[in-house]
Structure formats: C-alpha cells, structure tokens
Amino acid sequence: MAIKNNCAGALLLLAFSANLWAHGDVVPQAVKTEGLEALGEEWLEENPYRDNSRAIEIGASAYNQNCAACHGLEAKSGGIAPDLRLLEAGALGDEWYKERVINGAVRDGRVYMPKMADYLSQEALWAVRSYLESVAIEE
C-alpha cells in the first residue's frame, strides 16, 4: 500500500512539474484597444500613449494577461525575467522596448521571450509600455 501511495505521489508531482515547465508555451491573449488612437502597421519610434490614462488601463490588463507570468505581478519581477519597472523612461527606453517586443530574446537557440509583436498589435504593446512607465521605479 505504501509503495502504491508513493508511486501515486510521484506521478502527481511529475504531472505538476510538467505544467510548470510548459508555462512558456501559452498563446498570448488578445488585447482590446478601443479608445486608443489607431497607429497603423509601421512601428513608431516613440510611445505615442505616454501618460495616457486609457492606455495605462489597457496596458495594465494586457501586462497581467501576457507578461506577468515571467515578469511578475504588478511588474515586480521575481527573478525569472528582467524587472520592467527599471526600464529607462522616455525615448531611450522606448527604443529598447520596441526592439525587444519586435525581435524577442533568443540566446543559444533558446527562446527567453517570444516576438510579442507577432501576437499583439502595436497599440496593445505601446499601451503595455505606458503601464510600465506608470509603475517605474529608480534604482
């Protein structure tokens, strides 16, 4: 009986562990951007929604649905991925952010961050940037 219980426990642990490793395979969730100015297909160089309260609201929701699993709730990283509250403000931070959401992050053939622009609109991603600037902290 004890062996049977130990085997059952080991199988449950294995099944749970597999789910943890698979979290990176989820499909990004769609983001509703009604109320934001349409931006078109060509990416802008700077965040057009900076300090826009509607964009911050949309960005907070989009962040929680698509980014928090790796970057932490309320953008407070638990160490898995960079703390996005520390991104540089303004145009310099926009440049880095844009490059990362368009190209993702791949090292040694491993995908650390998907190309989010393949899944979410420019409007949604700039809204996330607006949210991140609203919760930014200085080191």
Which ranges hold each PLM region?
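Electrostatic cytochrome c docking/interface patches
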Residues: P28-A62
